[in-house]
Amino acid sequence: MKITIGIPAYNEEKNIAKIIVQLKKVADQILVCDDGSTDSTSEIAESLGAIVIK
């Protein structure tokens, strides 16, 4: 069984890294739905291995 977790995000560059790091301990795949962020949320999420949907 594989676990996928989806995270909605908007301008969460200050929080997204620690959330993804913690979720990677229990999830096989992390999807971040970026709702038009104007900061580095998407780039940070991608650098940590999350799949980003814009």
Predicted regions and their residues:
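Structured catalytic core of nucleotide-sugar glycosyltransferases
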Residues: M1-K54
